Amino acid sequence: MSTKAQNPMRDLKIEKLVLNISVGESGDRLTRASKVLEQLSGQTPVQSKARYTVRTFGIRRNEKIAVHVTVRGPKAEEILERGLKVKEYQLRDRNFSATGNFGFGIDEHIDLGIKYDPSIGIFGMDFYVVMNRPGARVTRRKRCKGTVGNSHKTTKEDTVSWFKQKYDADVLDK
């Protein structure tokens, strides 16, 4: 019994998974992208507006140009597993942020196991995973707000080692 018991408060967990499809225009393509996210997550997606006008892309301020959905719990882990399978369980080192979150993109949503529908088309999407530890709520709650100490904050190294261990995955340097 020389091994020390792991503190359960130090275990990393997936707080949420955000799926985003940025279409770049409002209208029919945006509603079709919304259907894709609804099929994948079983939740109603939210439309995102452009922050400012970009004339070269033909985007106006406050025009709806993207859809996203936030998934939590076991469903988030299941969708993330399908996304990582498409990426062959390989992510680059720069996919991980300094705060311990990570993200990646896929080119075709049909790789996730969704049946191709010619009326919808094919969309790529971004996966973004927010990681935390138990006790992170103290920074966000309304009453008795507190801070998380530096030793308990999620770091890039913690997330990379968790990712390698949980998914038996590779993190490439380049």
From Swiss-Prot:
Cellular component aspect of the GO annotation: cytosol; cytosolic large ribosomal subunit; nucleus
Modified residues (N6,N6,N6-trimethyllysine): K75
Modification after translation: N-terminally acetylated by acetyltransferase NatA.
Modified residues (N-acetylserine): S2
Keyword RNA-binding among record annotations: yes
Pfam families according to UniProt: Ribosomal_L5 (PF00281), Ribosomal_L5_C (PF00673)
Subunit structure of this chain's protein: Component of the large ribosomal subunit (LSU). Mature yeast ribosomes consist of a small (40S) and a large (60S) subunit. The 40S small subunit contains 1 molecule of ribosomal RNA (18S rRNA) and 33 different proteins (encoded by 57 genes). The large 60S subunit contains 3 rRNA molecules (25S, 5.8S and 5S rRNA) and 46 different proteins (encoded by 81 genes). Component of a hexameric 5S RNP precursor complex, composed of 5S RNA, RRS1, RPF2, RPL5, RPL11A/RPL11B and SYO1; this complex acts as a precursor for ribosome assembly.
Stated name of the protein: Large ribosomal subunit protein uL5B
Organism: Saccharomyces cerevisiae (strain ATCC 204508 / S288c)
Gene expressing this chain: RPL11B
